[in-house]
């Protein structure tokens, strides 16, 4: 799993990013968790929940997190939230491949 390898190279930095941005949970899905990943063209697909009730703060954290993850992974990152997924076919596709990679309640990387 490509995403696992990238995170394990800089585990402390990844954990700090998740804590700084108050991530409640973070899932990876799509090609980065399958054998379909292409090092030249694939992006990283992430599903995140931020633990912040203020919509402005939550939005600012999401934008900052997206920018930081693109720097961390050195590639394009698609960052989605549960509430942004309205298409049932997309939801089913995400649910079929998603893997929990960070649990904010335990402040632990799970890969």
Please tell me what each predicted stretch does.
Residues 1-27, 33-40, 51-111:
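Catalytic core of pol beta-like nucleotidyltransferases
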């Amino acid at each position: 799993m490509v995403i696992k390898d990238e995170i394990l190279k800089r585990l402390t930095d990844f954990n700090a990013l998740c804590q700084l941005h108050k991530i409640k949970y973070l899932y990876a899905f799509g090609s980065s968790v399958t054998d379909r990943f292409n090092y030249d063209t694939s992006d990283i697909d992430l599903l995140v929940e931020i633990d912040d009730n203020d919509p402005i703060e939550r939005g600012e954290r999401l934008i900052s997190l997206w920018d930081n993850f693109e720097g961390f992974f050195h590639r394009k990152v698609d960052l989605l939230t549960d509430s942004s997924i309205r298409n049932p076919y997309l939801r089913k596709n995400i649910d079929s491949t998603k893997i929990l990679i960070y649990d904010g309640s335990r402040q632990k990387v799970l890969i």
